[in-house]
């Protein structure tokens, strides 16, 4: 295969030694047909990576360019022209098992900050989200058990993606409210590994502010929540 074109919003491409791509290999048929799932060595001539700095000031995502990149046919995952099926399967499993640990970490980070709040309504909102996050954790365990039994997560993966990312954003909003004016300063130096710079106000402020900005995209990446609701409408309601 000869691959040309860009791939954007690629997480940690600047650290990766391989990348997967959905490439157009046949223009006949429906748009989702004629797509092939390829693994590409990042050291292949013609591959270049351009960084994208996020709203939080981080370099996590990138745009990768492919200029006459030669990829052997042995690097196909699945079958030629059936890459969309492979990608959907990959995303289904990702959406069904990627959120509980992150939510539990976020709760543990926020709990000390919320505990110092004198706003009863904010504390109640936090505990409501805590219960919902733990429900996500239990549901994820249930899905993992079904996967171990050889079953598919099905539409449950879309439900998980919607609920978990919206809980994440709600927790981020609580963190900003709890930080108050300490949530405003842009403290990149305090977040640098090995830096001796101290945070203004709450020690957790630099990370929580960065998380708030980065997670604005949580309901978009991995398949937007609007698309997930359409999947549920079709799979569960027959609409």
Feature map (PLM): residue ranges:
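A generic structural signal for well-ordered coil/turn residues at beta-strand boundaries
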Residues: 15-17, 34, 43, 59-65, ...
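Glycine-rich phosphate/cofactor-binding loops in nucleotide/flavin-utilizing enzymes
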Residues: 85-98, 182-239
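Glycine-rich phosphate/pyrophosphate-binding beta-alpha loops
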Residues: 8-13, 55-56, 217-224
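A short core secondary-structure module
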Residues: 4-50
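C-terminal helix-coil-helix/basic helical segment that borders enzyme active sites and/or dimer interfaces
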Residues: 120-123, 134-196
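Short, well-ordered loop/turn and helix-capping segments at boundaries between secondary-structure elements
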Residues: 24-28, 41, 45, 71-72, ...
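Buried hydrophobic positions in well-ordered alpha/beta secondary-structure cores of metabolic enzymes
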Residues: 3-5, 38, 66, 126, ...
